[in-house]
């Protein structure tokens, strides 16, 4: 399997995941954990990490998806290895990951007292997933880390973008809907990146209110 085939397989795996999606809530713990794994995995694919490493990550996620489908008594779909016709979406995924990298870099510079202050301030938004650093090099640490909480909306925006991209994969000849879903996916990725930057500014000015005049 090469990088292009791996990306095709990624979307097919996400299609399997989506088949369970409409049965449950996004707030279900395992659901969020899988979205986080998919975020991690696609970032690694775009960076073209070592292919053997990527296949190992792929197999772990595929097993999780299989177990997840069994948990909700959903049969796997018989999907062929279909790819998107073009790659306009990649630029906007890269913007999303760049925003996430800034977010993680910002959080890493905070001490424990500052983290707690932000946690209290953002208590209604702090039910997301956790990230370790801008490289995301270790899936095990990526899953276990509980320092960097991604806002719930960012998970939702990523997931909604993937739903539209998966529709394009399953309906490659429907040109009218293809472009419409591509535009929606891009808009969700832009919204997700904006949400991350907005949180950075919110937390920064909470911790350093004297600098708030910089916003004007």
Each predicted region: which residue ranges?
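Short, charged/polar, low-complexity loop and linker segments
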Residues: 166-180
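Charged, amphipathic alpha-helical scaffolding segments
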Residues: 66-83, 177-191, 195
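Membrane-proximal, non-transmembrane alpha-helical segments
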Residues: 88, 190, 215-216
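Inward-facing hydrophobic residues that define packing positions of alpha-helical scaffold repeats
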Residues: 158, 165, 182, 189, ...
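N-terminal pre-first-transmembrane soluble regions of secretory-pathway and organelle membrane proteins
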Residues: 1-168
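Long, hydrophobic, amphipathic alpha-helical segments used as structural scaffolds
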Residues: 104-107, 111, 169, 193-208
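Extended, non-membrane alpha-helical segments enriched in charged/polar residues
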Residues: 40, 163, 167-170, 187, ...
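Polybasic, proline/glycine-rich intrinsically disordered low-complexity segments
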Residues: 54-58, 77, 204, 208-216
């Amino acid at each position: 399997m090469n990088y292009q085939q791996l990306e095709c397989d990624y979307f097919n795996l996400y299609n399997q995941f989506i088949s369970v999606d409409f049965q449950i809530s996004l707030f279900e713990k395992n659901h969020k954990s899988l979205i986080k794994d998919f975020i991690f995995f696609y970032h690694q694919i775009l960076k073209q990490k070592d292919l053997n490493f990527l296949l190992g990550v792929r197999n772990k996620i595929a097993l999780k998806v299989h177990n997840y489908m069994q948990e909700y008594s959903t049969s796997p779909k018989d999907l062929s290895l279909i790819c998107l016709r073009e790659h306009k979406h990649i630029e906007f995924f890269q913007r999303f990951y760049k925003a996430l990298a800034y977010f993680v870099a910002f959080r890493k510079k905070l001490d424990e007292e500052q983290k707690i202050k932000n946690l209290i301030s953002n208590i209604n938004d702090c039910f997301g997933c956790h990230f370790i650093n801008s490289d995301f090099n270790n899936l095990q640490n990526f899953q276990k880390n509980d320092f960097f909480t991604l806002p719930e909306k960012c998970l939702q925006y990523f997931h909604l973008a993937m739903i539209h991209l998966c529709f394009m994969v399953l309906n490659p000849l429907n040109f009218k809907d293809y472009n419409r879903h591509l535009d929606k996916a891009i808009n969700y990725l832009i919204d997700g990146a904006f949400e991350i930057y907005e949180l950075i500014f919110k937390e920064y000015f909470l911790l350093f209110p004297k600098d708030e005049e910089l916003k004007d």
